[in-house]
């Protein structure tokens, strides 16, 4: 009788454990078995150390034909379930290529990109220009009907905002104001395919195109909802200008100019993104208050 096959022993990165031990403990426990399953199913050989963010485990692999690729293991949830669909909808330009995917688990096999992100571009203004040019091309694509909608997300935000009670009266007034603004935007919340997390770390260098976008959290909605992630990333570069408020406005204006997004809607939906992040944290991040002040959202 053959001995039972045991799953590969792996050391799960601490950041991944911290992110998922409460919400997805079963997924963490199944990772070794799941890794073996997809290595076998897609005829892959591991070729390097694990990479990871807070949400997924990235495994460098080589396909049977010798092609280098990345195996992405992640819990299946509302953010990940349409990732492959979104990337294939945008494909072949501007985004990483999906080589294989399993819709049942949101597991992806992706083309191997370089490890360099837009965070490595020394000039943050040039990095923003590159990001905005990519964004401008992505936001013209209609969203597939399977993708969840900004209309639903915004409706949930307004409902949750009604129950949020902050200690600071001024911050509470901002929450109430932003919720009112979002409520007015809901009837025209858009139908374009949005990335929802388009910041400098999610744009990687590539051999087939200078820069490619990775890791969307797909949403059907108004492109004006896309700007916020780039506003609050590479924050130290904004601070280093010596005039933080002006640097925020300059970055915002650059993205609006390149993408062609309506400025008033961009301001309104940026207030909505501030509200969303406050609802997630039950508090105002000082950076978000600074952005709100600089853009006169207060």
What are these model-derived regions, one by one?
Residues 51, 56-62, 70-71, 98, ...:
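Active-site acidic catalytic loop and adjacent metal/ATP-binding pocket
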Residues 206-253, 257-260, 290:
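Active-site Asp-x-Gly
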Residues 19-23, 242, 276-298:
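ATP/Mg2+ or Mg2+-diphosphate-binding catalytic cores
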Residues 32, 64-109, 116-138:
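A conserved alpha-helical element in kinase catalytic cores
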Residues 26-40, 143-196, 206, 257:
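An alpha-helical support segment within catalytic cores of ATP-dependent transferases
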Residues 2-14, 117-173, 190-191, 218-222:
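A cross-family kinase active-site recognition segment
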Residues 2-47:
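Juxta-kinase regulatory segment immediately upstream of eukaryotic protein kinase catalytic domains
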Residues 64, 76, 92-93, 106-124, ...:
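A glycine-centered beta->alpha junction motif in the catalytic cores
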């Amino acid at each position: 009788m053959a001995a039972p096959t045991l799953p590969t022993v792996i050391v799960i990165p601490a950041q991944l454990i911290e992110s998922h031990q409460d919400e997805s403990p079963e997924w963490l426990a199944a990772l070794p078995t799941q890794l073996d399953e997809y290595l076998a199913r897609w005829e892959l050989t591991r070729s390097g150390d694990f990479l990871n963010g807070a949400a997924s485990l990235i495994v460098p692999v080589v396909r049977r034909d010798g092609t280098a690729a990345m195996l992405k293991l992640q819990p299946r949830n509302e953010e990940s379930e349409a990732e492959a669909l979104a990337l294939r909808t945008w494909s072949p330009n501007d985004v990483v290529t999906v080589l294989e995917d399993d819709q049942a688990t949101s597991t992806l096999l992706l083309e191997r990109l370089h490890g360099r992100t837009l965070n490595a571009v020394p000039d943050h203004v040039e990095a923003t220009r590159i990001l905005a040019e990519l964004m401008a091309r992505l936001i013209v694509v209609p969203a597939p009907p399977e993708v969840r909608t900004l209309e639903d997300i915004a409706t949930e935000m307004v409902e949750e905002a009604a129950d949020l009670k902050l200690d600071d009266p001024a911050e509470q007034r901002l929450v109430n104001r932003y919720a009112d603004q979002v409520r007015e935007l809901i009837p025209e919340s858009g139908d374009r395919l949005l990335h929802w997390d388009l910041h400098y770390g999610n744009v990687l260098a590539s051999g087939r195109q200078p820069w490619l976008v990775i890791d969307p959290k797909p949403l059907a909605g108004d492109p004006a909802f896309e700007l916020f992630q780039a506003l609050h990333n590479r924050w130290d570069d904004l601070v280093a200008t010596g005039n933080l408020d002006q640097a925020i406005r300059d970055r915002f204006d650059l993205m609006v100019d390149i993408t062609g997004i309506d400025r008033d809607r961009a301001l309104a939906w940026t207030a909505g993104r501030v509200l969303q992040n406050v609802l997630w944290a039950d508090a105002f991040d000082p950076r978000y208050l600074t952005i709100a002040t600089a853009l006169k959202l207060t």
